[in-house]
From Swiss-Prot:
Feature type site, description Essential for channel activity, possibly by being protonated during channel activation, and by forming the channel gate and the selective filter: H37
Membrane topology: Single-pass type III membrane protein
Lineage, uppermost ranks: Viruses, Riboviria, Orthornavirae, Negarnaviricota, Polyploviricotina
Modified residues (Phosphoserine): S64, S82
Purpose: Forms a proton-selective ion channel that is necessary for the efficient release of the viral genome during virus entry. After attaching to the cell surface, the virion enters the cell by endocytosis. Acidification of the endosome triggers M2 ion channel activity.
Positions with biased composition (Basic and acidic residues): 71-80
Regulation of this protein's activity per its record: The M2 protein from most influenza A strains is inhibited by amantadine and rimantadine, resulting in viral uncoating incapacity. Emergence of amantadine-resistant variants is usually rapid.
Cell compartments where the protein resides: Virion membrane; Host apical cell membrane
GO molecular function, one term: proton transmembrane transporter activity
Sites carrying sugar chains: N20
Name listed for the protein in its UniProt record: Matrix protein 2
Gene3D superfamilies: 6.10.250.1640
Amino acid sequence: MSLLTEVETPIRNEWGCRCNGSSDPLVIAASIIGILHLILWILDRLLFKCIYRRFKYGLKRGPSTEGVPESMREEYRKEQQSAVDADDGHFVNIEPE
């Protein structure tokens, strides 16, 4: 017996599936999850550039300085710059003679 005859059987002169009309909760849950997965995948492909560009560039901002006095903001900037300047000494400059 072939796989085709085990899965699909002729019903009233039509081809149908044995699982039609199944009220098994597992089948219903799997169908819902499958449909939601398909919808989310399609949205992801359509909005790929918008979504990932937002994550890539939108989240690279520094900590919020809202409500922080200007003097503390300037001090923070100096600390960040001095950390960058200190790290520059790590690299060796090789100059051709």
